[in-house]
Curated annotation (Swiss-Prot):
It comes from Syritta pipiens. GO terms for cellular component: nucleus; perinuclear region of cytoplasm. Forms a heterodimer with timeless (TIM); the complex then translocates into the nucleus. This is Period circadian protein. Coiled coil: none annotated. Residues 69-98 have a biased composition (Low complexity).
Length: 109
């Protein structure tokens, strides 16, 4: 039997999929029409060493990250990469611009 201290799921948790579908059906304007991330910066070529075929935690640790991963599990087969900012270490700033990604139904499925 379940513990009496367990919180029942909220209305939003119970209706997550319906809310998500309603969001995409509404066709929200999430980015300007002229925005095309592929044409934005074709001069950038990702370095080969950024490719990581091991677990995301191992990939992160291999790129200079450290720490406990806890109980990290993933049910999806996403291609995750670790990003380390070495240009302005410790400043929290970067001179490079990061392209924005439009949230699409395919990204969260």
């Amino acid at each position: 039997s379940k513990s009496s201290t367990e919180t029942p799921p909220s209305y939003n948790q119970l209706n997550y999929n319906e809310n998500l579908q309603r969001f995409f059906n509404s066709k929200p304007a999430t980015a300007p029409v002229e925005f095309d991330p592929i044409k934005m910066d074709q001069s950038y070529n990702e370095p080969a060493e950024a490719e990581c075929t091991v677990s995301p935690v191992q990939c992160f640790e291999g790129s200079g990250g450290s720490g406990s991963s806890g109980n990290f599990t993933s049910g999806s087969n996403l291609n995750m990469r670790s990003v380390t900012n070495t240009s302005n270490t410790g400043t929290g700033t970067s001179s490079e611009s990061v392209p924005l990604v439009t949230l699409t139904e395919a990204l969260i499925s």
